[in-house]
Amino acid sequence: MDIRTGNGFDVHAFGPGDHVWLCGVRVPHHRGLIGHSDADVGMHALTDAIYGALAEGDIGVHFPPSDPQWKGAASRIFLEHAMGRIAARGYTLANCDVTLICERPKIGPVAPAMREALAEIMGIAADRISVKATTSEKLGFTGREEGIAAIATVALLQA
């Protein structure tokens, strides 16, 4: 049996705005996240974890930020592409785990909605998806509330 794991990491800085996109959910916040696409840091880390497990680079390889067609793009496009690559390579996604690192917004109240949104985008059961959060105890850029970071891990099984 061929089992593959992948890890992804992403960060985005805060900027002007009244919400952030996190794991496919629009979360009200007094600032937005700056990025070439919709800056969904959780979905970007998850997408990179999938590409990593497949040894197919990262989001930038598949969707170059220098290409204007991806300006403002919904991150679900990237995740759907990565899921398609899993199937094309003969794998299935066993499970995934996303950790959002921020002081605010608080993730706990919206984590179930994030799991459901990811399940819908990925076409898998929500019980195969974990979304959780932690803080950096007021240390570093996330502690100073300058942005949000995300870490994701996936496990793939040969179909």
Swiss-Prot record:
Keyword Kinase: no
Residues engaged in binding a divalent metal cation: 10, 12, 44
UniProt cross-references to PANTHER family, sorted A to Z: 2-C-METHYL-D-ERYTHRITOL 2,4-CYCLODIPHOSPHATE SYNTHASE, CHLOROPLASTIC
Taxonomic path: Bacteria, Pseudomonadati, Pseudomonadota, Alphaproteobacteria, Rhodobacterales
Catalysed reactions listed for this entry: 4-CDP-2-C-methyl-D-erythritol 2-phosphate = 2-C-methyl-D-erythritol 2,4-cyclic diphosphate + CMP
Function (record text): Involved in the biosynthesis of isopentenyl diphosphate (IPP) and dimethylallyl diphosphate (DMAPP), two major building blocks of isoprenoid compounds. Catalyzes the conversion of 4-diphosphocytidyl-2-C-methyl-D-erythritol 2-phosphate (CDP-ME2P) to 2-C-methyl-D-erythritol 2,4-cyclodiphosphate (ME-CPP) with a corresponding release of cytidine 5-monophosphate (CMP).
Domain of life: Bacteria
Name of the featured protein: 2-C-methyl-D-erythritol 2,4-cyclodiphosphate synthase
A GO BP annotation: isopentenyl diphosphate biosynthetic process, methylerythritol 4-phosphate pathway
Cofactor binding, note field: Binds 1 divalent metal cation per subunit.
Transmembrane stretches, start-end: none
Protein's gene: ispF
Recorded metabolic or biological pathway in which this protein acts: Isoprenoid biosynthesis; isopentenyl diphosphate biosynthesis via DXP pathway; isopentenyl diphosphate from 1-deoxy-D-xylulose 5-phosphate: step 4/6
Binding-site residues for 4-CDP-2-C-methyl-D-erythritol 2-phosphate, renumbered to this chain: 10-12, 36-37, 58-60, 134-137, 141, 144
Family: Belongs to the IspF family.
Cofactor: a divalent metal cation
A single MF term (Gene Ontology): metal ion binding
Keywords annotated in UniProt: Isoprene biosynthesis, Lyase, Metal-binding
DNA damage in keyword set: no
Enzyme nomenclature, EC number: 4.6.1.12
Site (Transition state stabilizer): 36, 135
Pfam families: YgbB
Subunit and interaction comment: Homotrimer.
